[in-house]
Amino acid sequence: MNNIIKMLNEEQMKQDVPEFGAGDTVVVKVRVVEGGKERLQAFEGVVIAKRNRGVHSAFTVRKISNGEGVERAFQIHSPIISSIEVKRRGRVRRAKLYYLRERSGKSARIREKLATK
């Protein structure tokens, strides 16, 4: 019984998910259906949390839109996610960046992780 559940979970997992973590700036392309038409909607922001639970893995992205903070949670292996693109790697010391909710402007900046040779 346990092996069957494990096999079903592995079938549903996407293989083309890039490596990313808290502090990284990502662009998530989401499939949106409007009036019978399907289009891709891009949501770009900073990953403030990531939860690794196999098929149930999820992450939260935060961006500032018109001066207002917007957060959106995504399931990594969801069929509505078309692609995830990592724009910038951030250097942070925390796994969850919930403190960014209270900050704005320069205090909400995240240092960039430089590529190692």
Swiss-Prot record:
From the broadest rank down, the organism's phylogenetic lineage runs: Bacteria, Pseudomonadati, Pseudomonadota, Gammaproteobacteria, Alteromonadales
Ordered alphabetically, the record's keywords are: Ribonucleoprotein, Ribosomal protein
Q: Which residues form a coiled coil?
A: none
**Species annotation:** Shewanella sediminis (strain HAW-EB3)
Which PROSITE patterns does the record associate with it? RIBOSOMAL_L19
Q: Which Gene3D superfamilies match?
A: 2.30.30.790
Q: Its domain of life?
A: Bacteria
Q: Which InterPro entries match?
A: Ribosomal_bL19 (IPR001857), Ribosomal_bL19_CS (IPR018257), Ribosomal_bL19_sf (IPR038657), Translation_prot_SH3-like_sf (IPR008991)
Q: Which Pfam families match?
A: Ribosomal_L19 (PF01245)
A cellular component term from Gene Ontology for this protein is:
cytosolic large ribosomal subunit
Question: What protein is this chain from?
Answer: Large ribosomal subunit protein bL19
Q: What does this protein do?
A: This protein is located at the 30S-50S ribosomal subunit interface and may play a role in the structure and function of the aminoacyl-tRNA binding site.
Q: Which NCBIfam families match?
A: rplS_bact (TIGR01024)
Which GO BP annotation is one of this protein's?
A: translation
> What GO molecular function annotation could you give as one example from this UniProt entry?
structural constituent of ribosome
UniProt family annotation = Belongs to the bacterial ribosomal protein bL19 family.
